[in-house]
Every structure is written in structure tokens, then in C-alpha cells.
Amino acid sequence: MAVSEVPLVFVVGTGRCGTHTMWRVFESLPNTLSTHEGAGIVHAGPPSSLGKRLSMGCMPEFNAYLYHYAGEDIFRRTFEPDAEMTTLMDRCFAIRSSSIAWCRTNGIAYCDANAFGFNFINYLHTKFPSAKFIHLVRDGYACVRSWSRRDASTYPERLPAPGGISWLLAKPAPFPSEVVHGSWAHFDRLQRISWFWNTVNANIAERFDRIPVANKRVLKIEEVTQETIPGILNFCGLPQEFKPDSLAPDDPSAGPAIEWTPENERKFNALAAPMMEKLGYALR
């Protein structure tokens, strides 16, 4: 396989949307390096590399900088990175760039499923014009309920464990120009996660507007089946020999979940209706 033909695939989403599943599907393919939030195992390439574990990190620090220090003006620069922003993003992405270079040298496809990588989309399209991007989505009610179980790192109502702070800070907070900014301090946890689901999906959708149709796809995790996987792999330019058991349920959330009472549905709909409708999910 020529260097220019090596597939590069980036899967982005809110988290709890199926990135773990897509990582496992890609990992089951021959001649492919698949990572989930920076972690993976080398299954192809020189014998000396086989079995090597990668731990590149999920890059939460860049999101934490944008949302909790830099401000909206700097955040907007990531949509069309200038030279200074590109230099910063190059440094943040350096370890992955090295892995991609290794894959290209060895003729191996590179697949990156990362729920923290959405702010790199436009940078990556400029850096790798042939790369394919998948916006992986999940029904908002199911996704928010799943996130509600992750109370240590997702807008917790109590003090987090030290290990969860970087994950917590990677979650966005409203910029002053946003309508909900003045209400944020009074939002309960359900409202914050609902806003998060809508905001991250809207962010990705706006970034996708700047990417050619041939390089992008919006994919509902509910529609990822043995029957649809071949078409997904064809879009990505990847081998078709996936293992069906890679679709088995995995990485479930644990802990108590919110209940969809009429009041909670009202709160969710007030914040997340725009993206529910845009993505083709029915409101309750």
C-alpha cells in the first residue's frame, strides 16, 4: 500500500455514543492501528512492534484550556487555525502525528476514536486532507442517561476524585455570549449534561460544515450493525474483514442514572431539541 493510500479515520462524538464500539470494530481489521482515546495495541507492522501498547492520552488538556481559560475568541480560532494556533495544536497532537507517520511508513491504516478530539477536526482536515471523519451520535435521552451514571467526571454535584479532575475540566462550560451563561450556576446536573450533549454535537456539526462531503459522515450508533458495517468501512477505505463479535455490548456505565420523568424530559427538550431534530431523533 502506497503512503498516500493509507487510510486515516477520525471518529468524534460526545462520549457514551459508541466510540468504544467503533474502536473495537476497527481493531478487528487486518493491517490497521486502532486507538480509543489514545490507547491501543499494535496488531500489524514489523514483528518487533507487535503487541506494543500505545498510551497517547485523550488530550483533555486542550479542551480544558479552551473552555476554562482561553475564552471564546481563542476557541473560534480552532475552526480556521492561524499559524500560532496551528503551532499549539501541532504540539498537542505531536505523539499522534508520530504514530500516523509510523503507520504511513509501514502501510498501516490509522483509526482514532476519541470523544475529546472534536476541537481538532478542522486542524486535522488541513493537516491530512484525505482523512475521513465520522460524527458518531446517539439518541440524546440514552446518551444523557448514560453520562449521568458517570457522576465523578461529568458535572458532578460533589467534589471529584483527584483522578477525575482532568476529565471534568475537559467538559465545556458556556461562554459569556451564550444564552445559558447567566443560568448555568442554577442548572441542575441533568440540565448541564443535556446542554453538553447539544453543544458538543452542534460544535462538531459546525466544524463538519467546513469539510467536503466526500470526507465526512454522520453516523447513528443505533444503525451500526453487521449489515451496515461494510458500507461504513467502504467509506473509510478500510478492509472489510471485521469480526462480528466486535459489536458486542462493551464498556457500560455504572452507578445510578437519572429517570426520564415528564419534568426531566421538559428540561432536556428545552436545551437539546435543536440537535435532536437536526440529527433525526424524535423528541418525547
Q: Which residues does each predicted region cover?
A:
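PAPS-dependent sulfotransferase catalytic core
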Residues: 1-94, 244-249
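PAPS-dependent sulfotransferases, especially Golgi type II membrane carbohydrate sulfotransferases
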Residues: 1-9, 156, 171-284
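Hydrophobic/aromatic beta-strand patches that form the interior of the parallel beta-sheet core
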Residues: 9, 33, 129-134, 217-219
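Acidic-histidine catalytic/liganding microenvironments
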Residues: 29, 128, 211
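Short aromatic-enriched loop/helix-cap "lid" or pocket-rim segments at secondary-structure transitions
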Residues: 45-50, 124, 145-150, 155-156, ...
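Conserved phosphate-donor/acceptor-positioning beta-strand/loop module used by diverse small-molecule
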Residues: 113-115, 124-149, 222
